[in-house]
């Protein structure tokens, strides 16, 4: 178990998040009420326990959401225990592995309208306007907050993912922040982690898995139960508990019960739905359980890597070269491979289910390339295997071949034999790269005929994250099934995300920061 203690934990501090800056757009009054120092003062005697540690605020998770919450609480004078399931070298959750872009529309009203349009009326049910307005209203503060608090410089970029939306043009040309030094490589997360880890009053507990919540008889969250190796740990939170520990991408049972489509996962393998398991024991409402980014990337499971990475999705998608084609299990092409992926929603063709055969004919599917295409596979610059594991597809051709996930041949006929498909069907799919016309509308300039040695790798969709979890209000408070807040219990980030249907890229990072702080 790793511990980072930056100041001995005093018991008398200023109230949790007392400054208006700390609350921003997420409802100062109600947040303060939920975390006032008086909140647990009248706890019944039966709530007295043999606590292993006591602090003001417990924050679970070291991604953007957890770091934002811990930073603002410590800045306001509270003592914070920051709990992380992973070892320190693997801390950070999906925040560490993502592209580091932050959706931050400058115009609140227009941003709210765009969010509502792409979410749609059906999925807006139960999503209060106040929550959306708190999110979008707080997002425009992200650039100044990152610069002022962490000296992270950003620049603006137009990354509207759904330009066909009626409200798209109103969002503006500067709707997304990206690090001044460029995307990827944890350029936002790493400096945040360093600052928070060195802050006075923040104690970081690594290899400490959150397992349960602790309530007093008044129904207030007063602490958590955790596990450090073989040892249980009981941590008292005198002012509040913040759950910011991500979703359930690596919990196969939860995925099967909530996500319609099978897929691999792209981020941290420590996201196994621990907070959902805990919250389900209590009168806590849930939302957006079927919301996930279904095919943001495509790739294989990294079975040849060590146990820290062997469950992870390994990006093999081609970017920057026109020499590739996708086919179903039978070698038949089925879509324009180059269409905008829109975080997977532009790839609905992958999830076609043939009810007559009771199968997913395109799960898995084949990506056929030639030798010159190999350096362009899996170069997105994000993902757990790439960022934390330090490897990518261009470096792993031999591993892909030896694992049986990739085959190669000198002719289409030989390749078809190794793929187990009919040569005539595969030949037709490969020939589609040669002609100007295209059955699925792929532009001629985005096609290049294949030559020389051919390769085929069998791919699956890779989701970035799930969005389901405990429902939150505009003040980041987790709520009961009747809509009233669970006192002193908060959430931020992908755990119970506000995103319910179509997802705007970089939106999760933004909400991590807004609701976290």
Regions of interest found by a model, annotated:
Residues 276-278, 285-418:
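An anion/pyrophosphate-binding glycine-rich loop and adjacent beta-alpha core
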Residues 236-302, 509, 515:
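Glycine-rich loop(s) and the adjacent beta-strand/alpha-helix scaffold that form part
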Residues 425-499, 503:
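A glycine-rich dinucleotide-binding beta-alpha-beta segment and adjacent secondary-structure elements
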Residues 53-55, 231-240:
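Core beta-strand elements of the Rossmann-like FAD/NAD(P) dinucleotide-binding domain
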Residues 137-232, 252, 299, 435-451:
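Conserved redox-cofactor binding core of oxidoreductases
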Residues 51-63:
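Beta1/beta-strand and adjacent pyrophosphate-binding region of the FAD-binding site
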Residues 78-94:
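Glycine-rich FAD pyrophosphate-binding loop
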Residues 1-12, 22-30:
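N-terminal secretory signal peptides
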């Amino acid at each position: 178990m790793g511990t980072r203690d930056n100041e001995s934990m005093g018991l008398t501090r200023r109230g949790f998040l007392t400054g208006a800056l700390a609350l921003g757009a997420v409802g100062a009054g109600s947040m303060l009420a939920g975390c006032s120092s008086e909140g647990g003062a009248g706890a019944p005697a039966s709530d007295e326990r043999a606590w292993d540690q006591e602090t003001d605020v417990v924050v679970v998770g070291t991604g953007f959401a957890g770091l934002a919450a811990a930073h603002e609480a410590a800045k306001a004078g509270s003592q914070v225990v920051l709990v992380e399931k992973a070892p320190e070298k693997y801390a950070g959750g999906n925040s560490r592995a993502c592209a580091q872009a932050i959706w931050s529309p400058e115009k609140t009203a227009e941003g709210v309208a765009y969010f509502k349009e792409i979410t749609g009326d059906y999925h807006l049910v139960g999503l209060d306007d106040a929550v959306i307005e708190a999110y979008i209203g707080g997002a425009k503060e992200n650039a100044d907050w990152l610069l002022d608090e962490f000296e992270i410089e950003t620049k603006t970029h137009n990354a509207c993912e759904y330009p066909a939306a009626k409200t798209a043009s109103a969002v503006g040309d500067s709707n997304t922040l990206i690090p001044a030094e460029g995307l990827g490589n944890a350029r936002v997360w790493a400096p945040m982690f360093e600052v928070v880890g060195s802050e006075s009053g923040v104690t970081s507990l690594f290899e400490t898995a959150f397992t349960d919540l602790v309530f007093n008889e008044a129904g207030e969250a007063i602490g958590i139960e955790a596990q450090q190796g073989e040892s249980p740990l009981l941590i008292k939170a005198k002012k509040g508990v913040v759950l910011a520990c991500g979703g359930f991408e690596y919990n196969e049972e939860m995925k099967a019960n909530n996500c319609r489509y099978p897929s691999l996962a792209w981020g941290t393998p420590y996201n196994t739905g621990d907070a959902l398991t805990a919250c389900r024991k209590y009168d806590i409402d849930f939302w957006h359980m079927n919301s996930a980014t279904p095919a943001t990337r495509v790739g294989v499971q990294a079975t040849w890597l060590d146990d820290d990475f062997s469950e992870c999705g390994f990006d093999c998608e081609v970017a920057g070269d026109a020499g590739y084609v996708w086919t179903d299990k039978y070698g038949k092409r089925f879509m324009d491979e180059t269409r905008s992926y829109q975080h997977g929603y532009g790839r609905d063709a992958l999830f076609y289910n043939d009810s007559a055969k009771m199968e997913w004919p395109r799960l898995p599917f084949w990506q056929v390339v030639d030798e010159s295409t190999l350096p362009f596979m899996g170069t997105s610059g994000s993902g757990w295997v790439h960022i934390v594991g330090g490897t990518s597809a261009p470096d792993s051709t031999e591993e892909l071949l030896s694992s049986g996930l990739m085959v190669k041949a000198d002719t289409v006929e030989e390749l078809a034999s190794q793929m187990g498909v009919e040569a005539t069907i595969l030949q037709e799919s490969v020939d589609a790269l040669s002609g100007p016309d295209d059955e699925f509308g792929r532009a001629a300039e985005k096609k290049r005929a294949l030559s020389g040695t051919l390769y085929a790798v069998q791919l699956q969709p890779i989701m970035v994250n799930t969005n389901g979890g405990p429902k939150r209000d505009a003040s980041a408070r987790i709520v009961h099934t009747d809509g009233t807040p669970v006192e002193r219990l908060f959430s931020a980030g992908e755990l119970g995300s506000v995103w319910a249907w179509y997802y705007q890229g970089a939106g999760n990072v933004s909400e991590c920061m807004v609701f976290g702080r």
